[in-house]
Amino acid sequence: MRPSDRTPAQSRPVTITRQFTAHAEGSVLVEFGDTKVLCTASFEEGVPRFLKGKGQGWVTAEYGMLPRSTHSRMNREAARGKQSGRTQEIQRLIGRSLRAAVDMKALGENTIVIDCDVIQADGGTRTAAITGACVALVDSLNWARGKGILKTNPLKFLIAAVSVGIYKGEPICDLEYIEDSEAETDMNVVMTETGKMIEIQGTAEGEPFSHEELLSLLELAKHGIREIVDIQKAALS
């Protein structure tokens, strides 16, 4: 039995609120249950030095958690003077995932900077961030097309992400914090809207998992992401 009484395949309620802030070209508040992440997409002219003159764009991401997004306050990383390894890992994951969804040639020599700030954390912050950032990215691309900066749509497909894991011996989808902290296996999966894999991050926290359990987890993720993509499409319609 899960703490929330959800079935093993059941995700938390997902809500996507677009145009959540006034200034960014794309901004989204994404909620996976009690996990809430603000995702903005800023469209900027120019590209990093290593891409200058190559006729293609770039998508990059930053990720952070507000000090009281967790049960007890944590210091801002800026106050500590450096980012944690976890933060660097997550923002690279977000950037990689979103770059898979964009035709960089069609983007031209422009950069989209994604900022994901966790307002409240209850597990699955990175998967919520990817899901919300994708919608913010779409809005920023539509803004650029509306301004005549882009002639064609660089978006190849929507992407979304969900966590899966083995909790008390049972594969489950979309882990909240209490499940994540006690899971024998924890996995984050990023997929396209058609069910193709972009990234799989999986770790046996306790007992090693079998090939059959891996396939079961991926099937749960595919089902969960399909539902999340439907919510993205409804938000964008």
Swiss-Prot record:
CDD domains, sorted: RNase_PH_bact (cd11362)
Enzyme Commission identifier(s): 2.7.7.56
InterPro entries linked: ExoRNase_PH_dom1, ExoRNase_PH_dom2, ExoRNase_PH_dom2_sf, PNPase/RNase_PH_dom_sf, Ribosomal_Su5_D2-typ_SF, RNase_PH, RNase_PH_bac-type, RNase_PH_CS
Sections of the chain in a coiled coil: none
Record: residues binding phosphate: R86, G124, T125, R126
Catalytic reaction(s) noted: tRNA(n+1) + phosphate = tRNA(n) + a ribonucleoside 5'-diphosphate
Gene3D superfamilies named among the record's database cross-references: GHMP Kinase, N-terminal domain
Function: Phosphorolytic 3'-5' exoribonuclease that plays an important role in tRNA 3'-end maturation. Removes nucleotide residues following the 3'-CCA terminus of tRNAs; can also add nucleotides to the ends of RNA molecules by using nucleoside diphosphates as substrates, but this may not be physiologically important. Probably plays a role in initiation of 16S rRNA degradation (leading to ribosome degradation) during starvation.
HAMAP family: RNase_PH (MF_00564)
Subunit field text: Homohexameric ring arranged as a trimer of dimers.
Record family assignment: Belongs to the RNase PH family.
Name this polypeptide is given: Ribonuclease PH
Organism: Shewanella sediminis (strain HAW-EB3)
Name of the gene encoding the protein in the UniProt record: rph
